[in-house]
C-alpha cells in the first residue's frame, strides 16, 4: 500500500514537473469559464425576456400582495360569496389574479362555483 502511494506521488510530481498536468488544468479552466459565461448569458436572457403582462417573476411581492387581498376578501364573509362580489374583485384586480387565487386556495364549493361564473361572465364577449 505504501509502495503504491509512493508511486502515485512520484507520477504526479513527474507530470507537474513536465507541465502536462498544468496544461490540462489550464484547458479545463478555459472550458469551464466558457461554460459558465454561456450559462450566465442564458440566465440573463431568461431574466430580461420576461413578458411584461405576466410580471410575476420580476415583482413577486406585488402579485402575492394582490392575491392575498383577494383571498382575504373572499374568506372574510361567513356567508356565500356572491357573483357580484367576485365581479367587483375581478374589476379591481384583474381576471388573472382571481383565477390564480381560485387555483391556489380552497374555497367552499358554492363559492368556487360563483367565482367561476363571475370569471366566465367577465370573459364572455359583450
UniProtKB/Swiss-Prot annotation:
Endpoints of the signal sequence: 1-22
> Where is the short sequence motif RxLR-dEER located?
44-58
Keyword set, alphabetical order: Secreted, Signal
State the compartments where it is located.
Secreted; Host cell
Q: Which GO terms describe its cellular component?
A: extracellular region; host cell
| Induction per the UniProt record | Expressed during host plant infection.
Write out the function statement from the record.
Secreted effector that triggers a hypersensitive response (HR) in 3 Lactuca saligna accessions (CGN05947, CGN05310, CGN05304).
* Record remark: domains: The RxLR-dEER motif acts to carry the protein into the host cell cytoplasm through binding to cell surface phosphatidylinositol-3-phosphate.
Task: Specify the protein name.
Answer: RxLR effector protein BLR31
